[in-house]
Amino acid sequence: MAPTVRRPVPADAAAMARVHVDTWLETYRGIMPDKLLDAPDFIDRRRQMWTNILTEAAPSAFICAAAEHDGEIVGIAMSGPPQNDGEPAGGGTEALRPEDRHLYVLYAYRSVHGTGVGQDLLDAVLDPSATTALWVADPNPRAQAFYAKNGFVADGTVKTDEYDGVREVRMVRPGRA
């Protein structure tokens, strides 16, 4: 049976933190510094983050989803208000608008890659009519191909993340009417 996607509840925070940390370990070893990935408080910081998001965040500000398989959370996603770094979106001249979205999180265990869970999570947290931006690690060809398949295009904006030192490429998907 394929994973099912649902809205998470505060009791899911610890499991979502575990998915967040485990998928970073699966995906980013060799891309992110080991000291960050191996930090003893890494899981605690992610647990606190998800607890805050699921209990304190303005309900309309963030949309979260959890994919569940056999009673276990195997994937997570979250979108929210745009990060407006003052850079034009999509190679144009307009910056992202407040009604646009930013995809902050989309992670799933490797064991469920290819099941459609990534697509289901993406669809659960994004409105196709909203212009959406995201930052994706570079290199991360699997993720970049997935986003390209979903209409995201690299807009030429590149940065090095201050938190983890990873080179990231911004991808933008124009809203559809």
Name the predicted role of every residue range.
Residues 3, 10, 21-30, 38-113, ...:
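Acetyl-CoA-dependent GNAT
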Residues 9-12, 140:
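Acidic/polar helix N-cap motif
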Residues 16, 20:
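Hydrophobic pocket/interface hotspot
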Residues 119-120, 139-156, 163-166:
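Conserved active-site alpha-helix within GNAT-family acetyltransferase domains
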Residues 128-139:
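Conserved GNAT acetyl-CoA-binding A-motif
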Residues 165-177:
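Terminal substrate-recognition subdomain of acyl/acetyltransferases
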